[in-house]
């Protein structure tokens, strides 16, 4: 593996409360820009998803809202999700709406856009507290989701029916993703494995990684359908090729890396956040090369990464900031 190039972000807060922090980054012209959320109350920002209007949604886990951030003005808007809400994950659906995993309400919540209409899809009656985490849409347009208490579930979007299945080996389901072919994979943080869902039966088949007790936290597919895994316990970034069954593993740079979020952009560049180093890394699989993007703020706490063409969005759960790395 080649040495990393360190590109620590530079810049300082401007005088205006919502002024952006610009961080020029060398080489490929990528740059980081950051904003304080500037909301009247602490949101507990957790996950982000690009919205169809050029804004960015975020889950306000602490306040029970869906946030919408406007990069042009630096302004945030909060949409209340319901009593007891504690949203975790958010993604944009095929219908251009925000779909949210809300562990506080024990429901999947849809927020229409731009009408902001809120609809909850509760888990089936009798389902214990699920600790809902993340969601992904399959090739048929149905939503699959994880519950860290030990479930994997589905919302049949056309009918609104919600079903759940117990996860293999109990608690731990966390990250989930869909491949370009429409298949769905998820990972177990407590179980240290990844799994593929049979979309017809809802059952999951476990795939064992080469590193024991690695703490698979999140997964993401590249354009070839390979599954990239952020390993919390081991500090590794790994990839599984379902076609060949082959695994590859790379240790994140640094003394004590803690890999949390993983995302693959439109160029098949992999992005992974490191709690141990207060940084985000890009990884070029062709050159097997990491590039580091550091934060000016301590304990940024990037728990998830998502983007759109030319933009990689980062929610800073530890600082109430939102950041973007522009790659084009």
Which role fits each region the language model picked out?
Residues 65-67, 107-109, 151-153, 193-195, ...:
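A short loop-to-beta-strand structural motif that recurs across blades of beta-propeller domains
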Residues 57-62, 100-104, 143-149, 186-190, ...:
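Conserved beta-strand positions in repeat-built beta-propeller and related beta-rich domains
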Residues 33-36, 77-81, 119-123, 163-167, ...:
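Beta-propeller fold detector
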Residues 28-41:
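A short helix->beta-strand "capping" segment at the edge of beta-propeller domains
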Residues 1-16:
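N-terminal secretory signal peptides and thylakoid transit peptides that target proteins
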Residues 40-52, 83-94, 126-140, 170-181, ...:
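Beta-rich, blade/repeat-based domains predominating
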Residues 70-74, 112-116, 156-160, 198-202, ...:
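Short loop/turn segments that connect beta-strands within beta-propeller blades
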Residues 303-328:
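Blade-level signature of beta-propeller repeat domains, shared across WD40, Kelch, NHL, RCC1
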């Amino acid at each position: 593996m080649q040495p990393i190039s360190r590109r620590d972000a530079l810049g300082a807060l401007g005088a205006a409360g919502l002024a952006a922090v610009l961080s020029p980054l060398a080489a490929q012209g990528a740059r980081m820009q950051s904003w304080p959320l500037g909301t009247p109350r602490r949101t507990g920002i957790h996950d982000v998803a690009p919205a169809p209007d050029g804004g960015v949604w975020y889950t306000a886990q602490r306040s029970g809202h869906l946030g919408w951030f406007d990069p042009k003005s630096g302004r945030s808007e909060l949409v209340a999700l319901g009593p007891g809400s504690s949203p975790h994950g958010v993604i944009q659906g095929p219908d251009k709406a925000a779909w949210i995993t809300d562990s506080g309400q024990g429901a999947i919540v849809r927020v229409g856009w731009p009408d902001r209409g809120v609809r909850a899809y509760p888990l089936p009656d009798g389902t214990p507290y699920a600790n809902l985490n993340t969601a992904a849409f399959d090739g048929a347009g149905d939503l699959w989701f994880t519950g860290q208490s030990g479930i994997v579930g589905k919302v049949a979007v056309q009918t609104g029916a919600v079903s759940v299945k117990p996860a293999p080996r109990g608690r731990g389901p966390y990250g989930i993703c869909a491949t370009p072919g429409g298949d769905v994979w998820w990972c177990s943080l407590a179980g240290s494995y990844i799994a593929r869902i049979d979309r017809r039966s809802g059952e999951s088949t476990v795939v064992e990684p080469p590193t024991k007790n690695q703490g698979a936290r999140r997964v993401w597919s590249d354009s070839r359908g390979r599954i990239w895994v952020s390993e919390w316990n081991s500090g590794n970034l790994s990839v599984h090729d379902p076609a060949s069954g082959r695994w590859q593993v790379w240790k994140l740079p640094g003394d004590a890396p803690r890999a949390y979020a993983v995302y693959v952009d439109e160029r098949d560049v992999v992005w992974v956040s490191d709690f141990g180093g207060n940084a985000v890394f890009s990884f070029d699989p062709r050159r097997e090369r990491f590039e580091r993007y550091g934060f000016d703020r301590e304990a940024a706490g990037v728990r998830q990464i998502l983007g759109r063409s030319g933009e990689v969005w980062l929610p800073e759960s530890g600082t109430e900031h939102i950041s973007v790395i522009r790659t084009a």
